[in-house]
């Protein structure tokens, strides 16, 4: 019985460790994707011409 308890605890511990490693990798990839999106947005802002705040090119009166 003691052998079963030890092996069960070992399996659960190893499963928890592998799960935490997977979560960490997932978090890192999400952060990289967010950084890429932010870089794209900043590039788009740099390429667009400067306009005063509140300016809209299509005004409907």
UniProtKB/Swiss-Prot annotation:
Q: Where is the signal peptide?
A: 1-22
User: Which positions correspond to the propeptide?
Assistant: 23-50
Which GO biological process annotations does it have? defense response; vasodilation
According to its UniProt record, where is this protein located? Secreted
Residues covered by region (Disordered): 24-61
The Swiss-Prot or TrEMBL record annotates one GO molecular function as: toxin activity
Superkingdom classification of source:
Eukaryota
Q: Secreted among the record's keywords?
A: yes
| Keywords assigned by UniProt, alphabetized | Amphibian defense peptide, G-protein coupled receptor impairing toxin, Hydroxylation, Secreted, Signal, Toxin, Vasoactive, Vasodilator
Compositionally biased tracts (Acidic residues): 30-41
Q: Which Pfam families match?
A: FSAP_sig_propep
Indicate where this protein is primarily found.
Answer: secreted
List the record's Gene Ontology CC terms alphabetically.
extracellular region
Query: InterPro entries from the entry?
Result: Frog_antimicrobial_propeptide
**4-hydroxyproline (modified residue): where?**
53
> What tissues has this protein been observed in?
Expressed by the skin glands.
Question: What family does this chain come from, according to its entry?
Answer: Belongs to the frog skin active peptide (FSAP) family. Bradykinin-related peptide subfamily.
- Briefly state the protein's biological role: [Hyp3,Thr6]-bradykinin: Induces relaxation of rat smooth muscle from tail artery (EC(50)=56.7 nM) and contraction of that from ileum (EC(50)=588 nM), urinary bladder (EC(50)=4.6 uM) and uterus (EC(50)=3.9 nM). Binds to both bradykinin receptor B1 (BDKRB1) and B2 (BDKRB2). In arterial smooth muscle, the effect via BDKRB1 is stronger, in uterus, ileum and urinary bladder that via BDKRB2. [Hyp3,Thr6]-bradykinyl-Val,Asp: Induces relaxation of rat smooth muscle from tail artery (EC(50)=3.5 nM) and contraction of that from ileum (EC(50)=223 nM), urinary bladder (EC(50)=1.5 uM) and uterus (EC(50)=356 nM). Binds to both bradykinin receptor B1 (BDKRB1) and B2 (BDKRB2); the effects via B2 a stronger.
Q: What is the protein name given in its UniProt record?
A: [Thr6]-bradykinyl-Val,Asp
Give the organism, scientific name.
Answer: Agalychnis callidryas
């Amino acid at each position: 019985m003691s052998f079963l308890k030890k092996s069960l605890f070992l399996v659960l511990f190893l499963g928890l460790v592998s799960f935490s490693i997977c979560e960490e990798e997932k978090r890192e990839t999400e952060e990289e994707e967010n950084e890429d999106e932010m870089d794209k947005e900043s590039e788009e802002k740099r390429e667009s011409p400067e306009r005063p705040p509140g300016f809209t090119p299509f005004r409907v009166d």
